[in-house]
Amino acid sequence: MKTNNIESFKFKTMKNIMKRSLLIGMALFIAGTVSAQNFRYIGADNCKTCHNKPEQGAQYDKWWYEDLHSQALESLSSEKAVEYAKKNGIADASKEPKCLKCHSTYHAAPENLRDGITENEGVSCEGCHGAGSNYRGTTIMRNRSFAVRGGLILQTEELCLKCHNQECPFYKWFDFKRDFERITHPNLSGTH
C-alpha cells in the first residue's frame, strides 16, 4: 500500500515537472519569436558610422563601392534584365516582387519593420546580417553572442542560397567558400 502511494506521488511529481518544462519551453519560444519580429531595419548609413573606420578596414566603402550586392537593385534595370523580363511577360523587373525579394533588402523586409531603410540600398548590410535595431550598439557588437541574440545573422551557405540558387534566371554555379572570399569585409577590431 505504501509503495503504491510513493509510486503515485513520483508519477504526479514527474508529470508536473514535465508540464512546467513544456510551459517554460513554449514561453521561451514565443518570447524569442516575438522579439525577432521586433528587430527593425535601420539602414546602411547607421552601419557606416562604425564600419567605415580605417581600423576596421573601411568595410562600408568596400561594400558600397566594390560589392555587387549594393548594386543588386540597379542590375534589374540592366539591358540583360530588361530583355529577360520582356521575354517572360514581366513588365518591369525592378518592380517585380519575385526579383525584388533578392535584389532589395527594402522589399524583402516586412513592411512594418523597414522604415529605417531606403529602396535604393540594393542588398544592404541588413540583407545579409539581419535587421540591426537591437544589435547596433558598440557594447552589444563587442560580444558576438549578445549581437546574435539582438538579431545579428551569421553568414552561412544556407543564408546565401536563399537567393543564389537556380530560381534566379541568371544563376551561375555558387561556391560558398570561393564566393564568400570575394565579398568578405573582415572586421579587424575583433568585434562580432
Identify what each model region corresponds to.
Residues 6-25:
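Bacterial N-terminal signal peptides that target proteins for export
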Residues 25-28, 129:
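Alpha-helical transmembrane segments
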Residues 31-33:
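N-terminal signal peptide c-region/cleavage motif recognized by signal peptidases
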Residues 36-121, 126, 132-155, 173-192:
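Sequence context of c-type cytochrome heme-c attachment sites
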Residues 158:
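Cys/His-rich zinc-coordinating modules
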